[in-house]
Amino acid sequence: MARAAPLLAALTALLAAAAAGGDAPPGKIAVVGAGIGGSAVAHFLQQHFGPRVQIDVYEKGTVGGRLATISVNKQHYESGAASFHSLSLHMQDFVKLLGLRHRREVVGRSAIFGGEHFMLEETDWYLLNLFRLWWHYGISFLRLQMWVEEVMEKFMRIYKYQAHGYAFSGVEELLYSLGESTFVNMTQHSVAESLLQVGVTQRFIDDVVSAVLRASYGQSAAMPAFAGAMSLAGAQGSLWSVEGGNKLVCSGLLKLTKANVIHATVTSVTLHSTEGKALYQVAYENEVGNSSDFYDIVVIATPLHLDNSSSNLTFAGFHPPIDDVQGSFQPTVVSLVHGYLNSSYFGFPDPKLFPFANILTTDFPSFFCTLDNICPVNISASFRRKQPQEAAVWRVQSPKPLFRTQLKTLFRSYYSVQTAEWQAHPLYGSRPTLPRFALHDQLFYLNALEWAASSVEVMAVAAKNVALLAYNRWYQDLDKIDQKDLMHKVKTEL
């Protein structure tokens, strides 16, 4: 009975707020998940509703989610998302807002390995790299660049729409507003099919495009074209990271928001209503035991899918019931290996002559996707990248944990191996339809957008959309939701 008392008090307070009228801001908001999506949506919700709204962020693990680091030999290295595209405008804004800095870039050459030899090798000379691309693949690389730039030019419209307060209740509506039926169709056709239509050769797709997609998604050119285009855009632009670790963005946003971080596993969301106003009871469990609280708005900022064994979140009291999100996720294993590279495996018996810091792979060898000589999250002015003959920290990305024999294939010897296993991205093609952000009146699924494309910036875009959607719904500003022909509307407003 003692435990029920604070719940009854909270419910009474929320009912009083609900009775105060439509102009009153929400009293309490719950966010489930403290990754980049959850921390960003907490920031955006406070930005729109004001500082008086209480925001509780539930996190069962570590703040940062798929932005994480691992300590190796007294240095910290990225084990999750390692870098961001220069056009990641929300992430750029977060870094400026929080007073963080870009990490100093340490240049290294890249190559694509095909199992027996290198398919493509980067040099230190830009014009020579272009000549090699032309010599091997004709103008396919130019056609690819034009295709990606066209997609990105349309996608960048989302920032203008969001700046004017527009939001979308479903992923399909958002995509249609940016690229009309073209973007929606790109979620149903493969990268390979789309590139062949614009004149990119099959050889270029097999040798280069597939390697980039394996590096970013762990998937092939059979994945949907829209997600593939977003991945290929990241490969073409300049990349950056956060000094001290990318996860500082998440912790910084939560601190700035003064969100109440509750370390617990959310088990259910139950609908209650009074006088036509929805209230949501969030039940959770932690080391202390089981408890629950009531909220005006709930945002789910963690993946919901049937094969996610770590998520047992259920929904009760909804009519019609909220369906499980269909589809599977692509497992990715990141292994940080402190050791000596076996350069002979890559055709360089003398390790001193091995010139590459980043190795991408085609479909073969299948046991790893990328191999990178990585730098710590804190880089001093005197820092230099380890030479191939020296013991270095290598990041190996693979679809499964590496066996000892596979580690021995890649490394002559090693001091330590530390791993992080992620349900990193949706397994594209495993879901027949695109999910919706709005699950109920004020219940939202932020991660819906990653079924169109998955990246840190995409999650930030989804966070802004959900915050605007919640705000516009709360104040019944329906003219700002799911509007068509937004380019014309925005130009008119300007």
Swiss-Prot record:
Q: Name one GO cellular component term.
A: platelet alpha granule lumen
Q: Which SUPFAM superfamilies match?
A: FAD/NAD(P)-binding domain (SSF51905)
Which subcellular locations apply to this protein? Secreted
- Name the residues that span the membrane: none
Q: InterPro entries from the entry? A: FAD/NAD-bd_sf, Prenylcys_lyase, Prenylcysteine_Oxase1
| UniProt-annotated glycosylation sites, renumbered to this chain | N342
GO MF assignments: prenylcysteine oxidase activity
| GO biological process annotation, one example | prenylcysteine catabolic process
Q: What start and end residues bound the annotated signal peptide?
A: 1-22
User: What's the protein here called?
Assistant: Prenylcysteine oxidase 1-like
